[in-house]
Amino acid sequence: MRRQLIISFFLVGLISTAVCAQTPIEGFIRDNAGNIVAGASVSLKRAEGTVVQQITSDAIGKFRFAAVEAGAYTLRTEAPGFYGSSYDFVLRARQPLSLTIELQHKQSLQQTVEVKSSSLTVNPEKTGSSYIFTRQDLDLLPDPLTNSTDDLVNNLMPGASDSHDNFLAVRGTEFSLHEFINGVSFLDNTQPQFSPGVSPQIFETVDLMTGGFTPEYGNRFGGVLDITTRSGADLAGHGDVNFRGATLDNYDLNADYGGQAGKLGYYFFVDGFTSGRYLEPPQPQELYDFGKGSRATAQFDWRSGNHDVFKLLLMGGGANFQQPNITKDQEVGRNAQRHLRQQTAILSWLHSFSPDTLISTSLYERTGSDRVLPTSDPDTPVSIASRVPLTLGIKSDLSHYWHGHFLKAGLDLVRLRENESFFFDGRGDPDVFPAFSGGLKGGQASVYVQDHFSPFRDLTVDLGVRYDYFDLVDTGVQTSPRIGLAYHFNKTKSVLHAAYNRYFSPPPIEYSLLASFIGHDAVKLDQRVGNVRLYTQNYYEVGWAQELHPRISLELNAYLHTGRNSFENHEISISRIFVPINFHAARSQGGELVLNMRQLERFGISGRFQYALSKTYFYGPITGGFAGDEPLVAGERIIPAFDQTHTGTAQIFYHNRWGGFWMGSAMRYGSGTIIEHGPRLPQHFTSDLATGFTLWTAEPRHLDFEFDVTNVFDSIYQIAKESEEIPIQYAPSRTIGGSLKFHF
């Protein structure tokens, strides 16, 4: 039966359809009295001025662009007898957008040409909480904020906070950074302990999503990075070479280039980096903490006629880094290391049958390796581990527009292979673990259907359902309904939104076989709690978005989620091997406030302020994975190590067109995480300063300089303590550095 189900899904996938981040835009052209304006010329331009598409409004004043990639755009509208209109907006991946453009009649005695300009500050159809950043937004940020996805999320995603051992927590979960790349998601976690990561420099857009996920986003929760990658066709034969250097051996050299040859667009990116404080160390002064890595990306886009688009994305990376020591281990020469490798390929095909119907297919693959190398000293504990994962999949969607309904149905078929090994010699440590080596094959089959529509004026509904079957170390099946509502108060420029999501989340794939092995064969009988289990959740969210002024918005969100078999990371003794653990139940609730001010051209000022209030509880007993030496009785409540009640971030920047001068600051505050059965760690506040200007220019070439100071006051605060036997980790110390960026 299982084989028949998978085969039938696969055959449907071959004849059915992942949308390559293509989004429809529709709207109506009216005059200021509400009358239809037919025959208006409507052109869609990218932020840099390239015309993407141009159409004419029909007899009822309607226009529609069937497939548009996410990004920043300007919609230019002109009609005889009317002043022109210019409308700026940012298009999210996979969210249809409806607009009403109002044109003003020309006065017969007035000879001057007037163009009405406006912008989309608050999206009236957004039913969840998300924050999109375009390539132009990312280019305006200082380098330390965009070094990695962790840096980006820590500063720009509401409620994100550091957890122990370089993990990040978002909305009550430690496995919280899930990448959705060109419509494809993977089970792999992006934290530096598991992955060399993806550079934000290859992003065309990134949508930082924290709640209200439609069925196509699968069963990711907490924090999702919906990423669209850069296309060479947009670079038009231009590129960059960037070098950054800072104290603590922080160096980064990267370059990119893109262009178009006939119908083929091409984009290349390479990056090499080092750091003398690669991981968060177990004491204020880092010891044996050097890391280095490299990443490369290539993307090819080919358009065949007006109906077919092919895209091939290739990514590869690796990192070698030392496992930081405490002073006692450093003195005896402990030298454990870790090596990570990862390669990804995504081939996508989009076919347009008509302006109303799109069909698309994505084939994807990811392979990698993780090797934990032992220390050569004779005294400290020895840990040896390896992991070789493989993911193969096909993700398919069919999109159709019908009488105001944006319908989408799809499936996702994934084949997984996981090979793991582990050996630990405590050398006097009281913990004893049996050696392990094994492999397992499994997979996931998912189907979904969803609708985005407006039942009546100013109300938008996202309605859908998803079915998932997952089989690896554990088998589970669930049907998950999703609903989101958004009501637009036109007069006050406000949006009230609410969402309910049911989730079915596979266990973290990293060392899940090892965790399940220990769950069955632990030396101590009370640690035999079985396989790592799937996490099921009910998720509720309500929010308010308000336009305070053009390009200035205020958003307030509140959420509650409860679930069974919640996840957390747990380290095996002091092996630096982190395996998943399940708790019987979890409850997390909180609120977030975001004040966003996009750059005001008149003043050259942009800024962003975020505050999050949250509380998370886990309830015993431990129900799967590696239980450790701290068992919980049924109903016993604990606060996880990543829980931080108050979190705040702020960025403020000033840009001046003269000489390309800019300056700004990024600040972060945290009230402190919890120590198990003890007090909270002290609160902390850090600030970064940055400035830059153009050294030389000869269009289109120019050379830019940037100067940065991170953690200005050198506040090396305590981040988190995962358990009694694991040391506290400490935040990065102050760095002083700069960069040169050559654009050609």
Regions found by a protein language model. Name each.
Residues 318-320, 326-327, 369-371, 419-427, ...:
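Surface-exposed extracellular loop regions of Gram-negative outer-membrane beta-barrel proteins
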Residues 301-319, 339-474, 595, 608:
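Face-selective signature of the C-terminal outer-membrane beta-barrel domain
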Residues 454-460, 558-562, 581-673:
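Gram-negative outer-membrane beta-barrel transporters
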Residues 301-303, 637-744:
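Conserved C-terminal beta-signal and adjacent last beta-strands/turns
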Residues 20-124:
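Periplasm-facing N-terminal accessory domains of Gram-negative outer-membrane beta-barrel systems
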Residues 58, 82-83, 87-102, 111-214, ...:
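Periplasmic N-terminal accessory/gating domains of Gram-negative outer-membrane beta-barrel systems
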Residues 297-299, 391-397, 435-448, 529, ...:
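Outer membrane beta-barrel strand-and-loop segments of large Gram-negative receptors
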Residues 245-274, 284-321, 337-359, 401-403, ...:
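Transmembrane beta-barrel wall of Gram-negative outer-membrane proteins
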